[in-house]
């Protein structure tokens, strides 16, 4: 395969090869004439020539000597990528027409919005609060009753309010154990009048985190489910199976309510599949980011039924890798119910997720309509499917699935995907193998140039990554992290341009000093082959690892290879002219369009997460790495243009100038990370806990007592931006770890201590909640197997955390929590998350300690923290006064808590 007709320079090189092999010293005229005939070996004969002209075109004749215009090539590629990005953006803004209001069988987004506004008007709905347990539950039951009155006689509606108590351990945030008591689930079963033996579950949660109205997480999902219930119940089409709607009231308590339902409710045994509605952002499209496990028929159901699909197996594999610090009820149904399902979530605008800005007015009616159309169609499909009743028969196998710009979904079994992938690999092997196996007198130095070019490509990527990481580390060290958080284009201008400039520099140096005697067209072909080979290696690796995401590499190998096979004749005759470039870019349309589509999703999800990922992970290093990787992928099939172009000086100068100016502006603090813009806020998250701590010794005496406001910034910048506004919050009040206390002696709400190691402690008066916690040892006894059993009782607010640290020579062997086996958190301590609904009894539990030797300092240290997340007890005058001082670009989430430590 050739990139162009044989140039005079190439002919001279071929003559030189023949001369070295004993040919005549000068080619006769007839040999020169024969040289005009096209080669059939698929190679330009090695491409080596005499010294290149200063222009760097790599040849003397037309086609080889006429290089691409640098300005035209650079602008053309830039406009090409911008056009593709515009198409991606347009696909994300597809408008959905609302069904006629009140028309039976149509989802009405305005009715769902009415539900949403009523739920969010109640305010924050933490588990155990009257807002969650009484007001929201009452509203849901009221609306369900109205729906039941309007329902078609073909259907039967049953309603149950469940208040489960239970415990489980979960491998999340380093691992911990959860205990819940008397929390609330509202369960509705819609079934045929004669009943049903099988059911599909739809799940949402109506509780919210503290200090947030929780419109997207997850009131909008519950509103969608209410409207879907209304539409299905009024339908004149009979269902084959039941649809169970679970409105759970304790998801934000780390998935407690779903565990209570699936392990204790009598209807749980009917469920064969589920759909979980969640949020990681506010509005936009709802992404299918988890399916299964296995059960490919569920993906097929979504593909067949969803009207506005948005799904990706890539998102599934990224989420299940644990990179994203989040989890959903999907895990509970999968692990404790052994039920397959589909997990959907809104992912756009995660900047205001779990903040006071998560309000109903920020969720577009279009988003509600899209979600409602999809959920209604998929539930109806499952409720009338024969596969639901025999789900076990269709259990085995995974699916490769992805949507195409939201228009439709492509899905096929992963085993078929593996076959397709290896067929693509074989195509590359045949293509490259033909070149590698040809005699040297035909291929010249192709093998050597290919291997050297591969090394140059890898060096260019490595040095580019090192360059952007050096920039990112420097920016982090000078305190200018997250400069791109409110201005994403800053990251592109800083890290993206640096990556491209370094790649171009390395290849330009190679072109000038190593490949100085090779034709441009020959080098263009070599580096196209190198890019093809690299993507083929990715394809083999991902397929061998069993990752369904390998389909992306297959696309990035198959389409470029087909493009090369289609355009080589035109290029051979006319060189790198406009027609060739147009066909080349057209052939790259699908891989580049889909890559940009995925890259948008990656940054839409990960950029906001980096603003709440803790104080230990440098966000600039993470973002720079991701951006550099994406840039390397996008530039891979354009590297050959560096060798086809006459020069790269202007491009490198422009990129370097943009990078340098952006770097200076970032270092000077021009780009402030946060925003209080009412239309698009991007706040800094800060947790304020006004607490009183009491430490007791082995005899029960209080040996230490203090009080203050414990401050945690949830991003890498800590309090550096806050100190100028609130001078008393500075590094002189940095909190210090209590080495002998579990989790450093602080009242962690969740075990995220390993993510947030920098915190501050501002002295303040003691707190005195009206409902103070009580903790006592009920009994201490020795078991027949020589362990010590300690039984405790605790009472307090709806949320408490219990911590245990075993002393040297002691181990926790059993306890009455979870499955009976104690689970450690990161750092070796034990963490128990406790919550209750209304009117819960005292919490009694026991632990068993195995002691190998007597210790005068006791066996274990335990501590209990009480968190007041609702009502008057959550506030204090000092806390309110401090909150008022915070600038409007922050979101300070504040509550009162106590911490009591004991030694036994």
UniProtKB/Swiss-Prot annotation:
Glycosylated residues in this chain: 182, 730
UniProt site positions, description: Transition state stabilizer: 353
Keyword Amino-acid biosynthesis annotated: no
Binding site for Zn(2+) 1: 205, 217, 278
Cofactor: Zn(2+)
Chain positions recorded as Zn(2+) 2 binding sites: 217, 252, 354
GO BP terms, alphabetized: cellular response to oxidative stress; endoplasmic reticulum unfolded protein response; proteolysis
Modified residues (N-acetylmethionine): 1
EC identifiers of the protein: 3.4.-.-
Gene Ontology CC terms, in alphabetical order: endoplasmic reticulum membrane; membrane
Main location, first listed in the record: endoplasmic reticulum
Disulfide bridges in this chain: 204-222
Lumenal compartment residues: 85-399, 479-489, 541, 601-621, 673-904
Topology Cytoplasmic: residue spans: 1-63, 421-457, 511-519, 563-579, 643-651
Family: Belongs to the peptidase M28 family.
Function: Within the ovary, required for the organization of somatic cells and oocytes into discrete follicular structures.
Stated name of the protein: Endoplasmic reticulum metallopeptidase 1
């Amino acid at each position: 395969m050739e990139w162009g007709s044989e140039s005079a320079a190439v002919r001279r090189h071929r003559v030189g090869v023949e001369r070295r092999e004993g040919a005549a010293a000068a080619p006769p005229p007839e040999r020169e004439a024969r040289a005009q005939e096209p080669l059939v070996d698929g190679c330009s004969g090695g491409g080596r020539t005499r010294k290149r002209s200063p222009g760097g075109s790599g040849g003397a004749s037309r086609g080889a000597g006429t290089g691409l215009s640098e300005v035209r090539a650079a602008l053309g590629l830039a406009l090409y990528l911008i056009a593709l990005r515009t198409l991606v953006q347009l696909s994300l803004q597809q408008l959905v027409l609302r069904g006629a209001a009140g028309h039976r069988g149509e989802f009405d987004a305005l009715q769902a919005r009415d539900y949403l506004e009523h739920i969010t008007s109640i305010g924050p709905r933490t588990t155990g609060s009257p807002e969650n347990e009484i007001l929201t539950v009452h509203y849901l039951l009221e609306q369900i009753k109205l729906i039941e009155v309007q329902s078609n006689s073909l259907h039967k509606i049953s309603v149950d309010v469940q208040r489960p108590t239970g415990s489980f351990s979960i491998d999340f945030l380093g691992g911990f154990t959860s205990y819940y008591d008397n929390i609330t689930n509202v369960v509705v079963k819609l079934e045929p009048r004669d009943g049903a033996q099988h059911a599909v579950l739809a799940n949402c949660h109506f509780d919210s985190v503290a200090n947030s109205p929780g419109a997207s997480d997850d009131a909008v999902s519950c509103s969608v489910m209410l409207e879907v219930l209304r539409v299905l119940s009024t339908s004149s089409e009979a269902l084959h199976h039941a649809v169970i709607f679970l409105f759970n009231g304790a998801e934000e308590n780390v998935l407690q309510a779903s565990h209570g339902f699936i392990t204790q409710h009598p209807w749980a045994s009917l469920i064969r599949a589920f759909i979980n509605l969640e949020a990681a952002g506010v509005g936009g499209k709802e992404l299918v980011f988890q399916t299964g496990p296995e059960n490919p028929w569920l993906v097929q159901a979504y593909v067949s039924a969803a009207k506005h699909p948005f799904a990706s197996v890539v998102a599934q594999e990224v989420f299940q890798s644990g990179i994203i610090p989040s989890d959903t009820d999907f895990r509970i149904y999968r692990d404790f119910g052994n039920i397959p399902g589909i997990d959907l979530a809104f992912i756009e605008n995660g900047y205001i997720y779990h903040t006071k800005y998560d309000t109903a007015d920020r969720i577009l009616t279009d988003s509600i309509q899209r979600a409602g159309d999809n959920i209604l169609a998929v539930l109806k499909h499952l409720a009338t499917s024969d596969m639901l009743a025999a789900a076990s028969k269709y259990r085995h196998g995974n699916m490769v699935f992805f949507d195409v710009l939201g228009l439709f979904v492509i899905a096929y079994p992963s085993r078929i995907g593996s076959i397709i992938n290896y067929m693509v690999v074989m195509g590359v092997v045949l293509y490259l193998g033909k070149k590698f196996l040809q005699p040297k007198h035909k291929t010249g130095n192709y093998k050597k140039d290919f291997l050297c070019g591969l090394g140059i490509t890898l060096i260019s990527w490595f040095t580019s990554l090192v360059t952007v990481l050096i920039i990112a580390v420097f920016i982090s060290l000078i305190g200018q992290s997250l400069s791109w958080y409110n201005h994403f284009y800053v990251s592109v201008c800083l890290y993206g341009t640096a990556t491209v400039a370094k790649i171009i520099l390395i290849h330009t140096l190679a072109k000038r000093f190593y490949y100085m005697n090779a034709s441009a067209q020959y080098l263009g072909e070599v580096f196209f082959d190198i890019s093809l080979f690299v993507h083929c290696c990715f394809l083999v690796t991902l397929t061998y690892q069993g990752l369904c995401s390998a389909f992306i590499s297959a696309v990035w190998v198959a389409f470029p290879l087909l493009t090369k096979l289609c355009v080589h004749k035109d290029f051979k005759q006319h060189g790198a002219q406009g027609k060739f470039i147009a066909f080349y870019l057209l052939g790259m349309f699908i891989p580049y369009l889909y890559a940009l589509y995925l890259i948008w999703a990656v940054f839409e999800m990960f950029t906001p997460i980096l603003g709440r990922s803790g104080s230990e992970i440098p966000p600039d290093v993470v973002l720079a790495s991701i951006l550099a990787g994406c840039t390397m992928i996008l530039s891979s099939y354009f590297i050959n243009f560096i060798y086809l172009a006459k020069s790269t000086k202007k491009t490198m100068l422009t990129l370097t100038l943009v990078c340098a100016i952006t770097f200076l502006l970032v270092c000077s603090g021009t780009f402030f990370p946060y925003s209080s813009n009412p239309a698009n806020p991007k706040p800094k998250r800060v947790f304020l806990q006004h607490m009183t701590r009491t430490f007791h010794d082995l005899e029960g005496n209080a040996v230490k007592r203090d009080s203050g406001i414990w401050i945690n910034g949830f991003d890498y910048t800590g309090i550096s931006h806050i100190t100028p506004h609130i001078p008393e919050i500075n590094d002189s009040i940095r909190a210090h770890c209590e080495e002998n206390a579990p989790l450093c002696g602080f009242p962690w709400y969740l075990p995220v201590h390993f993510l947030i190691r920098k915190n501050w402690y501002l002295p303040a008066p003691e707190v005195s909640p009206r409902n103070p916690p009580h903790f006592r040892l009920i009994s201490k006894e020795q078991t027949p197997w020589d362990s010590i059993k300690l039984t405790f009782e605790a009472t307090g607010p709806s949320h408490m955390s219990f911590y245990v640290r075993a002393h040297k020579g002691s181990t926790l062997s059993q306890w009455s929590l979870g499955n009976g086996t104690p689970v450690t958190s990161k750092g070796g301590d034990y963490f128990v998350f406790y919550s209750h609904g209304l009117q819960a009894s005292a919490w009694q539990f026991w632990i068993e300690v195995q002691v190998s030797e007597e210790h005068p300092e006791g066996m274990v240290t335990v501590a209990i923290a009480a968190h007041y997340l609702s009502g008057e007890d959550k506030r204090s005058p000092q806390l309110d006064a401090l909150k008022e001082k915070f600038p409007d670009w922050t979101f300070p989430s504040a509550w009162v808590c106590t911490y009591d430590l004991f030694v036994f």
